[in-house]
Amino acid sequence: MAKRDIIKNQFHTYKDTYTGTNVTRLTEPDHVSHHMYFYNNMMTSDGKKLLYSAELNGERQLYLMDIETGDAVQMTEGTGVADYSGMITADDRYLIYRQGERFMKQDLDTGEEECFYETPEGWSAGGDLGPSSDYKYMSIVETRKDTTAKRKVGGNWDAFAENCLAKPLCRIVYIDMEKGTSRIIHEERCWLGHTQIRPIYGDKILFCHEGPYDLIDARLWCINIDGTGLTCLREQPSDLIITHEIWMPDGESVAYVYKETTGKMEENIRMIPMSTMKEEVFMNCSPYAHFNVAPSGKYMVGDSQGHDVPIHMLDHSKEKDRTGEVKNDFIYIVDVEARKEIKLCYHGSSWRAIYGNSQDTHPHPFFTKDSKHVIFTTDLEGKPCLYMAEV
C-alpha cells in the first residue's frame, strides 16, 4: 500500500455490560491498530477525523480516519515510521511525525512533505514529541547511541530497568519547526523522556527521569526553555510511584498520579501549581495506569489497572486471562469541578507487550474535541483495536 490509499474500517457498536455505555469499535481485531500517544493532538478541530496507526501487510503506517464513515487515508509509507509519534497541528494544516531520525511535516491537503529536523549521527530520537500550543516549537529527547543498554528498548519491557541503570547520555532539544533551527536545552547522564512544553506560556519544559519507580532518583522535572532553572518538582522515595504527569490545559499546574506501594497505599491525583510550586492533593482515584485531561480542563479520564503489579513487572509471556474474572480494568471519567469519579466502560486490556511495541495494549484514553466521547485502545476482542465510548 502507498500514501493516499484508502482502507475501509467496519464499525461495531455495543452496550457495555457493566455500565450500559454505548461503545463503538472503530477498527477490526484481526490486525494491530492504536491511536497516537495520548497527549498528542490526533483529531482535526471539527472532531471528524482521527489519526491512528495500523499494521497491515507487515508494516505500521499512519492513517487519518473519518469517524463517521470509517474510511481511512494512508498518510505515510516506507520503513521506520514511529507509530505513536503523529500529531495534527492546531490549525489543521499539517501532520507532524517522525520517520527514523527525521522529523517530518506533511501538508494535509496536498500531501507534500518536508523534513524540518534530523537527529545528528551518533544520536537517536525516541520517546514523545512535545509541541508548543501554537505548533511553532517542539521539544524532543535525543540519546547518545553508544551509552544505551545493549538490549533494544521498546518492543517489550525487558530492557526497561537495564536502560535506566545504564544512565545513557540524553539531551533535550528545542526545535523551531518553522525555521528548522534547534538548540540543546539540557543534557545529562540519565534516561530522559516525556518532554512537554508548557501550554499557553511556552516558557518551561516538563520532563521525566525515565525508568522503574524504585530505580530513579525522582520522576518530575522542569526547566526553562533557555536552559536555566532546572528544578526537581517533587522528591520521590523508592516505594512511591509517580506517573503520567501532564500540564493542565491552562498551563497553571502539573497534574500526575500518585501511588504508594507501602503504608496506607494511597492512590490519588495530585497537582503542583507553578505559582506556589507546592504539591496539592486533588482527589482520590482508582488505580490509573494513565490519565489525561480534556481540552476544556473540565474533565479527566483514566484507565484503571486491575492488578497491583506495575506494568513493566508483569509476566507478559502468560496467556490472556480467560477465567472470566472481571478486575478493575475500567475507563473512568473525573468531573473536575465536582471532584467526582464515574465509571465509563470496561476496557479489559491484557496489558501484554507481545504485539511489537510495549505500548500496544495500553488504553491511553483521551477525549474527543467536544468531550462527548473517549477514545482508547485495547486487545479485549483480539489484537489491539480502537474504541470510542460515549460520555
Q: Predicted segments — roles?
A:
Residues R4-I6, I140-K167, C208-D217, K259-G263, ...:
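Short, conserved, GDST-rich strand-edge loop motifs in beta-rich repeat architectures
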Residues M283-I342:
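Loop/turn-rich, solvent-exposed surfaces of beta-rich toroidal or solenoidal domains
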Residues P237, E280-N292, R339-F366:
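Conserved blade-ending motifs and adjacent loop-strand segments that build the rim/top face
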Residues G80-C170, I184-E187:
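Asp-box/WD-like beta-propeller blade repeats and closely related beta-sheet repeat scaffolds
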Residues T361-V391:
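Blade-level signature of beta-propeller repeat domains, shared across WD40, Kelch, NHL, RCC1
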Residues V32, M36-Y39, N57-G100:
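Blade-loop segments of beta-propeller domains
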Residues N40-K49, S85-Y94, R98, D128-Y137, ...:
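Blade-terminus and WD-like Trp-Asp/Gly-His loop motifs, strongest in beta-propeller folds
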Residues A2-T24, C164-C170:
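Blade/loop signatures of beta-propeller domains
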